[in-house]
Amino acid sequence: VVKLLMWEIGKNLKDSEKEFDRTVDYINETIKEYKKIDRDGAFFHNNSGVRALIRRGPLGVVLCLGPYNYPLNETFALLIPAIIMGNTAIFKPAKHGVLLIAPLLEAFKKSFPPGVVNIVFGRGREIAAPIMETGKINVLALIGHSSSAISLQDLHPQKNRLRLVLGLEAKNPAIIMDDADLELTVNECLNGSLSYNGQRCTA
């Protein structure tokens, strides 16, 4: 997977390894959180004289659309919570970063029943639009541009019932305090701005 990240989207070895490791860590942490949520759901909670049992369950079909610049980490940040909570996922990889999906397909086949994780390939406008028009998507999970999110929502026949998980064109300022270590701060700001040629929402 690391080599495929390097070959297809041009990440260097260090950044590709970091993306892979971050993804594995994220999956493990998500599983831990799910177990905690599951345990909490077995107990009644008291609040202001109200005794309640909180149960969380699947929402239905989730359409996951990840970005090309972090095709493993950011896409799995959408996909993994969806399937862990019992949803069915339709997952469309970004147009760049599809080669790494091949070895992962085998893992999905071994780990989940048929139809739980569904992967479609193609251009976003041509693939995602007709899927949204069916009205069978319960959750749109997208990391990308706000114009894409708006146009996809508008295609859904019941967009008032559509749940959204969106990460859209972030801009992140760096606030440097008077007591900051300037050498460390400058290095971190440069790394944050210029890693992967600045093609990242945290630049």
Feature map (PLM): residue ranges:
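A structured beta-alpha segment of the ubiquitous adenosine-cofactor-binding alpha/beta core
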Residues: 51-52, 119-138
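Periplasmic-binding protein-like
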Residues: 80, 138-143
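Residue-level signal for inorganic ion chemistry
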Residues: 5, 86, 117, 140, ...
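Conserved small-residue-rich beta-alpha loop and adjacent elements
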Residues: 40-115
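Hydrophobic packing residues within well-ordered alpha-helices of enzyme cores
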Residues: 27, 101-104, 131, 152
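ALDH superfamily catalytic-core signature
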Residues: 111-112, 139, 147-203
